[in-house]
Every structure is written in structure tokens, then in C-alpha cells.
């Protein structure tokens, strides 16, 4: 049998940062499209506004630091951060919120720590937490999905509400479902109903639910899952963190559901609600703020999944990924320290 022998050097080509970011952005698009389909044009407006703010802030900081503006903008990291913030916040949130959050992510969280590759926390999630703590009402006011909404916002409606211009529309009319009741997210609805003494089965008879999952949110998560799988296929991310996140959340929610099925959401509900798939494939996998070794990445991802379940069921914020990711970011150096690969020729430890 003849074997083909290639000439040296026997190396593989590493992906440039800009290429990786481009692939991540492209794989985000299916989720963004589905999210716009269910929650209106406001999401796209928020994303575009966030991109403008992020690129402007990046350019200003690079100018002040006397670094190359072109090189910094062309790595696409600021644009990716902007898109993640834009899809994470409610689609009709006031314009100044996305401006504050994006500027905070780029200027404070990213560049105050030294720029790309030096930040301790995920910039998008740090910005989300800042906005959530500072403006809890606006950050938890989502409109009803288009398929069960009494009224869906047009492009003009979205612009008027986001930029607070015109007086012929208000947020409340877009929160009403076809049953005439103001809607919250499935996670919010279930948590509120359980706190009022209703069972899971009773809560899930509401219009915001479709079987075991939430209306709209199942398809949004499915779209981000599809994009995430393509991202894995393109080798832009590794499988360890995403698998750890989903496994940790699945195991924790399965235990809770088996122990108390009347007061806990099912594993399927947790996996396809809120930002689960978005966070598992596009947020938690940030290589700068995550653990570095393969075993460390699995532990890092699993920790996020478990924290999400604990915060969702015991905390005050039903979609807990931002807090879980930031807490795991804090733990990443410790995970790397205690889960170091054994050096060749040396014993473990």
C-alpha cells in the first residue's frame, strides 16, 4: 500500500480572530431572524444601534490609546459583542439603554482590563447585568410572541417606542395576548405562577405555553442551536463548554423535576426557554473568559448549567445565564489552576 507523505512543516493553519468572529456572527443570524419573526423589528433595531455604538466606542478608545483603529475594528470583536447585547435585551427597550450597555461593555469591561484577550468578564453579559440591576422593569418587559399577540408592532411602531417619538402607541398594547391578558416570558410566567401556589400543569395551560415549552422561545432556541452546531462544524468553537452547559442544566433540571414535578419545569422546558442555546454556543464559549484546558472547559460549562438552574428556581431573575456566566468567569482561573494538564515527563500534580 502506498502512503502519501507530505513535506514539512507538518502544521495546521490557525484561524485569525477576525475569521472566527465572522463565523460566529454568521451563525448567529438564524437565531436573529427567528427572534425578529416572533418579537418584531425591535430586535434588529437594537442590534443595529448597538453595532453603531460599539464601533464608535472602540474607535474612540483606540484613538485615546494611540492604537490602530482599523486593526481593532476589523477583528469584529466589538461587532459580535454588540450583536449579543442587542439580541439579549427586550426588543422595545428605550434606545438609551442599549447605548449605556454597549458603551459599558466596550469601554469598561473590555478596554479597562487591557483590550481584547485581557478582559476577565464576558463584556456582553456584564453589560446585561448592569442594565438588569439598574433598570429591572425595562429589562423584564417583553412583548407577546407574534403568534399569540393581540397586536404586533410594525417597524414604525418599534422605532416610535424605542426612540420615544410619537404618542399613538404604547408598550402595553403589544404585551397583550389573544386572550387579552398581558404576557411575560415563559420563565417569568411559570416562576410567578408557582410562587402563587399554582402547579406546573395549571400554569402551562396559559397561552404563552405550547405543550412543554414556551411559544416562540422554542423556535428561537432551536435556531440558535442550529447555528451553534454549524459553529462546531466550522471548528470556530470546541464542544466542551457547550456540552457542559447543556448537560449541567439537563441533569440539574431532571433531578428537580423528578423530585417535584408539580413545582419544577421539565428539562425540555429549561433547555428551550430563555437564552439557553444562545448562551451555550455563543456566550459561554468566549475563549478569553473561559477555562482553557479540555477538562477545565467541561467543568466550566457544567458549572454554568447548574448555576442557571439554581438561579432560575431559587433566585429573583428567571433567565439566569448572565449571572451564571459571570460567576463562572470568576471561577475560570481557579479551574485552570486545579485542572492543569500533566506536563510530558512529569507526574500528575
Curated annotation (Swiss-Prot):
The modification FMN phosphoryl threonine is found at residue 185. Keywords: Cell inner membrane, Cell membrane, Electron transport, Flavoprotein, FMN, Membrane, Phosphoprotein, Translocase, Transmembrane, Transmembrane helix, Transport. The keyword Electron transport applies. It is found in: Cell inner membrane. The chain crosses the membrane at residues 37-57, 73-90, 124-144, 212-232, 239-259, 265-285, 291-311, 315-335. It holds the Pfam family NQR2_RnfD_RnfE. It is a multi-pass membrane protein. Its cofactor is FMN. Its EC number is 7.-.-.-. InterPro entries: NqrB/RnfD (IPR004338), RnfD_bac (IPR011303). GO terms for biological process: electron transport chain; transmembrane transport. Part of a membrane-bound complex that couples electron transfer with translocation of ions across the membrane. The complex is composed of six subunits: RnfA, RnfB, RnfC, RnfD, RnfE and RnfG. Belongs to the NqrB/RnfD family. NCBIfam families: PRK00816.1, rnfD. This is Ion-translocating oxidoreductase complex subunit D. It comes from Shewanella sp. (strain W3-18-1). The lineage of its organism: Bacteria, Pseudomonadati, Pseudomonadota, Gammaproteobacteria, Alteromonadales.
Amino acid at each position: 500500500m502506498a502512503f502519501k507523505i507530505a513535506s514539512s512543516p507538518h502544521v495546521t493553519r490557525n484561524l485569525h480572530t477576525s475569521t472566527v468572529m465572522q463565523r460566529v456572527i454568521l451563525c448567529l443570524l438564524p437565531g436573529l431572524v427567528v427572534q425578529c419573526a416572533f418579537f418584531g423589528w425591535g430586535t434588529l433595531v437594537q442590534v443595529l444601534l448597538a453595532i453603531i455604538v460599539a464601533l464608535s466606542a472602540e474607535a474612540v478608545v483606540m484613538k485615546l490609546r494611540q492604537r490602530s483603529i482599523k486593526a481593532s475594528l476589523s477583528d469584529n470583536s466589538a461587532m459580535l459583542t454588540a450583536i449579543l447585547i442587542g439580541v439579549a435585551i427586550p426588543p422595545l427597550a428605550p434606545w438609551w439603554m442599549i447605548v449605556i450597555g454597549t458603551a459599558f461593555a466596550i469601554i469598561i469591561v473590555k478596554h479597562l482590563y487591557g483590550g481584547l484577550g485581557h478582559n476577565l468578564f464576558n463584556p456582553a453579559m456584564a453589560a446585561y447585568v448592569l442594565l438588569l440591576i439598574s433598570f429591572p422593569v425595562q429589562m423584564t418587559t417583553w412583548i407577546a410572541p407574534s403568534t399569540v399577540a393581540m397586536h404586533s408592532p410594525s417597524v414604525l411602531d418599534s422605532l416610535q417606542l424605542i426612540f420615544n417619538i410619537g404618542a399613538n402607541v404604547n408598550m402595553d398594547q403589544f404585551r397583550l395576548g389573544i386572550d387579552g391578558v398581558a404576557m411575560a416570558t415563559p420563565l417569568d410566567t411559570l416562576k410567578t405562577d408557582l410562587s402563587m401556589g399554582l402547579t406546573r400543569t395549571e400554569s402551562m395551560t396559559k397561552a404563552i405555553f405550547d405543550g412543554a415549552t414556551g411559544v416562540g422561545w422554542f423556535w428561537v432556541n432551536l435556531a440558535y442551536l442550529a447555528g451553534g452546531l454549524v459553529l462546531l462544524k466550522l471548528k470556530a468553537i470546541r464542544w466542551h463548554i457547550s456540552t457542559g452547559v447543556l448537560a449541567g442544566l439537563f441533569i440539574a433540571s431532571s433531578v428537580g423535576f423528578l423530585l417535584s414535578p408539580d413545582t419544577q419545569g421539565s428539562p425540555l422546558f429549561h433547555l428551550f426557554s430563555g437564552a439557553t442555546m444562545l448562551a451555550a454556543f455563543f456566550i459561554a464559549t468566549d475563549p478569553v473568559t473561559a477555562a482553557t484546558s479540555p477538562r477545565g472547559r467541561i467543568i466550566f460549562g457544567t458549572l454554568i448549567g447548574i448555576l442557571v438552574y439554581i438561579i432560575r428556581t431559587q433566585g429573583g431573575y428567571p433567565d439566569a445565564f448572565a449571572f451564571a456566566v459571570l460567576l463562572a468567569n470568576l471561577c475560570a482561573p481557579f479551574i485552570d489552576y486545579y485542572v492543569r494538564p500533566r506536563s510530558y515527563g512529569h507526574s500528575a500534580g
